[in-house]
């Protein structure tokens, strides 16, 4: 497959990130490597979206701290970004609404085709009037040819950085003006862009808990967007999926990363990290990056059992 015929993917991870661990970052890296090896996908970006403060989880530190820790954790990555949108809303947002927000935002700022899992490739280009004999539209009439794949990916990458990139320390993070003029308007007919939910097997397993998830949301998350699962602790993902009628229904939309099931980062968790911090356990350096540890110590986070 050529670059233009492969599905271009943005991986979106929602969660507490309380704190963000090396395991979270490795989850992105492992998912990207796996998708690339299939030959069907090109991962062009990753988004870390920390949950709103009103989520109500015991021991959840302020989103201000979590956003800064997340940014410190990805500061050396050239493709993973932190997005504060979820934290800045008036109240907690569902995973479904976060996915829909990013899909709609990327439609507006890139002009790319953003499709659902089952959308055929003839999907109309969002944001362009559909008329017979429609020609590519440019603000600069001197542009002689349609944009190349490289130009398109550059535009998407630029937009993704503007949307997601936040830098501590600031009182309030700045992200993209959704009404901003991003320059040349092009019809990106060649590129199909999809946002996939990235998660661990623990989140996948939570879909099987009766009443925990809204079934309509599950239909959208799994049926429309799709999921990339990075198993933890050698979890049996086939067994998990067989326990949910919706997961069984959309099994083909769930991609399980099958690499090293004994990957050392697969046992790392935020809970283990907090416990290590509370007990002064030196193994915390195996769980968290040094900039995150330094920030935690400086801010005196997670120093007692309540979080």
Swiss-Prot record:
Its EC number is 2.7.7.1, 2.7.7.18. It comes from the Eukaryota. ATP binds at residues 24, 271-274. NAD(+) binds at residues 16-17, 92, 95, 200, 202, 212-213, 232. It catalyses: beta-nicotinamide D-ribonucleotide + ATP + H(+) = diphosphate + NAD(+); nicotinate beta-D-ribonucleotide + ATP + H(+) = deamido-NAD(+) + diphosphate. It is a lipid-anchor. GO terms for molecular function: ATP binding; nicotinamide-nucleotide adenylyltransferase activity; nicotinate-nucleotide adenylyltransferase activity; protein ADP-ribosyltransferase-substrate adaptor activity. Inhibited by P1-(adenosine-5')-P3-(nicotinamide-riboside-5')-triphosphate (Np3AD) and P1-(adenosine-5')-P4-(nicotinamide-riboside-5')-tetraphosphate (Np4AD). Its cofactor is Mg(2+). Monomer. This is Nicotinamide/nicotinic acid mononucleotide adenylyltransferase 2. It comes from Mus musculus. The gene is Nmnat2.
């Amino acid at each position: 497959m050529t670059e233009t015929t492969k599905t271009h993917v943005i991986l979106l991870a929602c969660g507490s990130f309380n704190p963000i661990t090396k395991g979270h970052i490795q989850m992105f890296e492992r998912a990207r490597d796996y998708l690339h090896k299939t030959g069907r996908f090109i991962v062009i970006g990753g988004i870390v979206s920390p949950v709103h403060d009103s989520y109500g989880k015991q021991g959840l530190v302020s989103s201000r701290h979590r956003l800064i820790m997340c940014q410190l954790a990805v500061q050396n990555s050239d493709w993973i970004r932190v997005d504060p949108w979820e934290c800045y809303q008036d109240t907690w947002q569902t995973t479904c609404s976060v996915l829909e927000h990013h899909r709609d935002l990327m439609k507006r700022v890139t002009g790319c085709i953003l499709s659902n899992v089952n959308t055929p490739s003839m999907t109309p280009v969002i944001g362009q009037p559909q008329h017979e004999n429609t020609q590519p539209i440019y603000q600069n009439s001197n542009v002689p040819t349609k944009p190349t794949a490289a130009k398109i990916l550059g535009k998407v990458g630029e937009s993704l950085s503007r949307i997601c990139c936040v830098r501590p320390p600031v009182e309030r993070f700045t992200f993209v003006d959704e009404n901003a003029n991003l320059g040349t308007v092009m019809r990106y007919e060649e590129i199909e862009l999809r946002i996939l939910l990235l998660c661990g097997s623990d989140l996948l397993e939570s879909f099987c808990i009766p009443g925990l998830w809204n079934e309509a949301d599950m239909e959208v998350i799994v049926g429309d967007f799709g999921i990339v699962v990075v198993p933890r602790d050698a979890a049996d993902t086939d067994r998990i999926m067989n326990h949910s009628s919706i997961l069984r229904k959309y099994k083909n939309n769930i991609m399980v990363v099958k690499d090293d099931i004994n990957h050392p980062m697969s046992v790392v968790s935020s809970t283990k990290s907090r416990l290590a911090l509370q007990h002064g356990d030196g193994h915390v350096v195996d769980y968290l990056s040094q900039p995150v540890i330094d920030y935690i110590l400086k801010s005196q986070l997670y120093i007692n059992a309540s979080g």
